Amino acid sequence: MSITLGEKACRWGLCLGLVLWVGREGILCYAAADDAAVPSAEFSGSLVKTVKGRQYHAQVFAKGDRLRLEYKYAIRTERGYAAIEIIRLDKSETWYLLAQQKELLVTGLSQDDLFPIRPALPGERDRILVGDATAAGRATQLFEVQTDRHGRVERFYEWVDLDTGVVLKLVSRDREWSFEYERFRLSPQPAYYFEEPPGYNKRMATTGP
């Protein structure tokens, strides 16, 4: 199974134009590209997203404002297939590693490229604390959150890790959509996970992110 780059943001990424909210399939991907506080915790985890009974998986590695996603199924880009994506918020760029071509395909980071780290959701209008809960075996606070993106209202349950502020689980109350960490581990991440691989040529994408 492969996923085109154009579809990736909808299937694997929580497209914050909010294609995510439009109900397209994939792993939620909303890494804040703005200046709001991004949790500085370093961690790795296994993400699973369920859409209408179908599941999608990815491994995630985070180090401050740098993220690495290793997909179970490759993403088809304009230059070939990529199983690894690196999100560099500090550069406002997304990199796709094309192993066969030894190329690093670079796209700009748009507001539609988000990752499940911080609690604030795009278009958030209301947030109510429900109480204490658990997710991924960790203590969390459970919130009811309502968003409104371009007139589309959606309600969510959101589990936020008490220690790190990272979103560990997000469930839509209005459609068959959920995301959660099956595994979440706080641990130092090697810097090279988020750098340009040696021997790769950098190439700018001709299409948008």
Please provide the spans of the model-predicted regions.
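Extended, positively charged loop/linker patches that create polyanion-binding surfaces
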Residues: 114-116, 125-131, 140-146
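N-terminal leader/targeting segments and the immediate start of mature chains
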Residues: 2, 9, 13-67, 188, ...
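Residues that act as N-cap/strand-start positions at coil-to-secondary-structure junctions
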Residues: 43, 52-54, 79-81, 126-127, ...
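Structural motif
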Residues: 51, 135-136
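A short, amphipathic edge element
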Residues: 53-56, 118-130, 179
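An acidic-aromatic
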Residues: 59-117, 172-183
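Gly/Pro-enriched, hydrophobic low-complexity segments
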Residues: 73-85, 136-201
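Short, exposed beta-strand/loop patches in secreted or surface proteins that constitute
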Residues: 58-62, 85-87, 126-133, 158-159
